[in-house]
């Protein structure tokens, strides 16, 4: 497993991350398939969108279908018929999202099973075991994603627990002789001192890549990108930087300018299910009445299946009003492709040293305003 930075434009980078199941060109956007499926579409349709890697969730796959079923198929790739790389969240996000159903200890986390209500116990070692059997190309350490806002004292204690869990994850990952990649997750809330503490200790332990966690949980964009900028300056240049859970198009561009290489988010698929379709000229809210008789495709120059087969805005509006599953599928295909086209254009702009021009054109079209004057980074 190798990561190489191939070109830079300011702090933005184009890189190549080589995994067992394929090569990922970065910056890369990762569609979310929490339960081993990107909602509404097939694995082939995800691949046709240009996606290079999928994110799935360790915790939920452990509960359903369970490891025994996945072992029958050998790994998660064969289970979901996706032959590209897979990254799996360790279960740490569920420490945040299921906060009313869990109890944190230094040993691990007790959860109430959201399916049947039974008590289950997840530890760093167990998370590494599960991800090993899933066959994840990129494994994430077990951590706590802290809610926002939280006190300095709470986050400081959480960082220490997560550092302990990261070290245990590293030791058990190595004990399994897992030949895939192990990424650490830098926590610390909105406090630079705690982010620095987390990052420096994780760098000392040594990991294949570093994720920036604990963001997009309610903080302002200004706070978010202040932390992203700060942490990217600490992560070693030769390691991939992964910003978790952030995915608005303008946020991706800003983070790329700050030096981020990878992203995941549910926005393209969730918004598709709610009739929000992304284009180079802004968002089309397909359920609006003005599209009832609109014969145009979602976007004239889009090369996705939905636009190329000329499914009209009028038809998609009708499907949305009728709550037809075909509409969700066609919307999702378009949004997934939009995100991959955006990343392709970003990578090409970096290669040509024209990222500033690309960003200025994007901001003009979207009437988008920088939160931190990030153009100074390119």
Swiss-Prot record:
Give the taxonomic lineage as stored in the record: Bacteria, Pseudomonadati, Pseudomonadota, Gammaproteobacteria, Enterobacterales
According to its UniProt record, this protein's enzyme class is: transferase
Q: Which residues bind substrate?
A: 89-93, 143, 187, 214
Q: What is this protein called?
A: Queuine tRNA-ribosyltransferase
Q: Which molecular function terms from Gene Ontology are attached?
A: metal ion binding; tRNA-guanosine(34) queuine transglycosylase activity
Q: How does it assemble?
A: Homodimer. Within each dimer, one monomer is responsible for RNA recognition and catalysis, while the other monomer binds to the replacement base PreQ1.
Q: Binding residues for Zn(2+), per the UniProt record?
A: 302, 304, 307, 334
* Region of interest called RNA binding, as start-end residue ranges on this chain: 245-251, 269-273
| Record-linked InterPro entries | ArchSynthase1/Queuine_TRR (IPR050076), TGT (IPR004803), TGT-like_sf (IPR036511), tRNA_ribo_trans-like (IPR002616)
Record-listed E.C. numbers: 2.4.2.29
Q: Where is the active site?
A: 89, 264
- General function of this protein: Catalyzes the base-exchange of a guanine (G) residue with the queuine precursor 7-aminomethyl-7-deazaguanine (PreQ1) at position 34 (anticodon wobble position) in tRNAs with GU(N) anticodons (tRNA-Asp, -Asn, -His and -Tyr). Catalysis occurs through a double-displacement mechanism. The nucleophile active site attacks the C1' of nucleotide 34 to detach the guanine base from the RNA, forming a covalent enzyme-RNA intermediate. The proton acceptor active site deprotonates the incoming PreQ1, allowing a nucleophilic attack on the C1' of the ribose to form the product.
In which pathway is this protein known to take part?
tRNA modification; tRNA-queuosine biosynthesis
**What Gene3D superfamilies does the record point to?**
Queuine tRNA-ribosyltransferase-like
User: To which species is this protein native?
Assistant: Blochmanniella floridana
Q: Which UniProt keywords apply?
A: Glycosyltransferase, Metal-binding, Queuosine biosynthesis, Transferase, tRNA processing, Zinc
Give the SUPFAM superfamilies listed for this entry.
tRNA-guanine transglycosylase
Q: GO CC terms on record?
A: cytosol
Cofactor section = Zn(2+)
Q: How is the cofactor bound?
A: Binds 1 zinc ion per subunit.
The catalysed reaction is:
7-aminomethyl-7-carbaguanine + guanosine(34) in tRNA = 7-aminomethyl-7-carbaguanosine(34) in tRNA + guanine
PANTHER family tied to this protein: QUEUINE TRNA-RIBOSYLTRANSFERASE (PTHR46499:SF1)
Gene coding for it? tgt
Family, similarity comment? Belongs to the queuine tRNA-ribosyltransferase family.
């Amino acid at each position: 497993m190798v990561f190489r930075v191939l070109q830079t434009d300011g702090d933005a980078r184009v890189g190549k991350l080589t995994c067992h199941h394929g090569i990922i060109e970065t910056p890369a956007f990762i569609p979310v398939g929490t339960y081993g499926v990107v909602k509404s579409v097939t694995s082939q349709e995800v691949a046709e969108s240009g996606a290079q890697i999928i994110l799935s969730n360790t915790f939920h796959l452990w509960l359903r279908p369970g490891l025994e079923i996945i072992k029958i198929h050998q790994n998660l790739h064969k289970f979901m018929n996706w032959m590209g790389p897979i990254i799996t969240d360790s279960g740490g996000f569920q420490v945040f999202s299921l906060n009313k159903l869990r109890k944190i200890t230094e040993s691990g986390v007790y959860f109430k099973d959201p399916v049947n209500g039974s008590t289950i116990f997840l530890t760093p070692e167990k998370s590494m075991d599960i991800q090993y059997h899933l066959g994840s190309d990129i494994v994430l350490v077990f951590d706590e994603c802290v809610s926002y806002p939280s006190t300095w004292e709470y986050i400081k204690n959480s960082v220490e627990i997560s550092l302990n869990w990261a070290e245990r994850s590293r030791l058990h990952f190595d004990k399994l002789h897992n030949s895939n990649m192990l990424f650490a997750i830098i926590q610390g809330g909105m406090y630079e001192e705690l982010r620095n503490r987390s990052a420096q200790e994780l760098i000392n332990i040594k990991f294949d890549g570093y994720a920036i966690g604990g963001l997009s949980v309610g903080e302002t964009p200004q706070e978010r990108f202040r932390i992203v900028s700060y942490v990217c300056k600490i992560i070693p240049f030769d390691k991939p930087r992964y910003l978790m859970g952030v995915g608005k198009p303008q946020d991706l561009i800003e983070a790329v300018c700050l030096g981020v290489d990878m992203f995941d988010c549910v926005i393209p698929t969730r918004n598709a299910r709610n009739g929000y379709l992304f284009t180079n000229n802004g968002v089309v809210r397909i359920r609006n009445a003005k599209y009832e008789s609109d014969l145009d495709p979602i976007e004239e120059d889009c090369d996705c299946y939905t636009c190329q087969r000329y499914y009209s805005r009028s038809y998609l509006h009708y499907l949305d009003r009728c709550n037809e599953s075909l509409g969700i599928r066609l919307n999702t295909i378009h949004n997934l492709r939009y995100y991959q086209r955006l990343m392709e254009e970003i990578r090409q702009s970096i290669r040509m040293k024209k990222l500033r021009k690309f960003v200025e054109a994007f901001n003009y079209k979207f009437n988008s305003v920088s939160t931190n004057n990030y153009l100074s980074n390119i």
